[in-house]
Amino acid sequence: MSSTAPLLTPYKMGRFDLSHRVVLAPLTRQRSYGNVPQPHAILYYQQRTTKGGLLIAEATGISDTAQGYKDTPGIWTKEQVEAWKPIVDGVHAKGGIFFCQIWHVGRVSNNTFQPNGQAPISSTNKSLKPAVRANGIDVATFSTPRRLETDEIPFVVNDYRVAARNAIEAGFDGVEIHGAHGYLIDQFLKDQVNDRSDKYGGSLENRCRFALEVVQAVTDEIGADKVGIRLSPFASYSEAADSNPEALGLYMANALNKFGILYCHMVEPRMVKLGEKFETPHSLRPIRDAFKGTFIAAGGYNKEDGNKAVSTGYTDLVAYGRLFLSNPDLPERFEIDAPLNKYNRETFYISDPVIGYTDYPFLPSDV
């Protein structure tokens, strides 16, 4: 396959010159012991770095209430910021562009992850039913959340702002606000979760208010040219569905245009559940057409799908998760049409610093 395949063409994303359009999607790996990024992440991200390639770091907690999983990284303490620096430096040493995904899980948590064993915070006090974890084995139980009071919300918005500033201090090129997959921002966006009667609930405009206040705070802090957001209007992860996902996606796309943010990263409608593709009549096209910045599509893409999505103008960039996890040299494999390593789901979330993490083979150097 020649390097003129659409996925392998250069792209100018704001001030960043990308050499290709294959993006490392944000992937939770649960190897940041005690919520602190570890030295083994240097190799993991470096392996997946190409000169001019865009990488989005795994979901990273913004505060001590943001956690809901074992050993996920944070960026709210000095220790965490310092621990990220060599990881970011490793990506930059190979010419990569690195964004930090800033995250609050909201009610997708339980009190064992919370300071002083308190209830997780959310838009609502409706609790989640126990759910099988993404590894298909463990069952997660969730504590009944505490509905945030109206006057508390600005403090949470500020946590995102501080996390964004910390990410820039750690050397990241920008941040991606995690507004997808049933986590805190999504708990405000989706009408199946948000049952508030204040200015953050009810109408579409009110449900989007929290997300847009976060965007405002983060862009004010670090500049719109360093800010992206990830959204999944069509998804129903963690019981977070919406009765009119198209309207939600379009409203957000148009509202985001006013801030001039760098990119919008959307999850395909076919990805209703983690790792499972469904046929769907829905499309991201109207949302993509409405949004004026760079558009990134994600969710179950292979090489052929990705090339078609770029060539037809359906998206600018394509984010790959599981394929990039198991193929550290994915852009090169796409370029020469090499076979792909199969991923092993059983090692996605184990604590081992090597197995299932940095031990996926590269192509032989003589290929």
UniProtKB/Swiss-Prot annotation:
User: What is this organism's lineage?
Assistant: Eukaryota, Viridiplantae, Streptophyta, Embryophyta, Tracheophyta
Provide an example Pfam family for this protein. Oxidored_FMN
Superkingdom classification of source: Eukaryota
Q: What does this protein do?
A: Putative oxophytodienoate reductase that may be involved in the biosynthesis or metabolism of oxylipin signaling molecules.
Named from the GO MF annotations, one term is:
FMN binding
Q: What is its EC number?
A: 1.3.1.-
What keywords does the record list, in alphabetical order? Answer: Fatty acid biosynthesis, Fatty acid metabolism, Flavoprotein, FMN, Lipid biosynthesis, Lipid metabolism, NADP, Oxidoreductase, Oxylipin biosynthesis
What is the designated name of this protein? Putative 12-oxophytodienoate reductase 11
What family does the database annotate?
A: Belongs to the NADH:flavin oxidoreductase/NADH oxidase family.
Where does the record place the catalytic residues?
Y183 (proton donor)
Residues annotated to bind substrate = H178, G179, A180, H181, R270
Protein residues bound to FMN: P26, L27, T28, A59, Q101, R230, G300, G321, R322
The cofactors named for this UniProt entry are: FMN
One GO process term, biological-process aspect: fatty acid biosynthetic process
Native organism: Oryza sativa subsp. japonica (Rice)
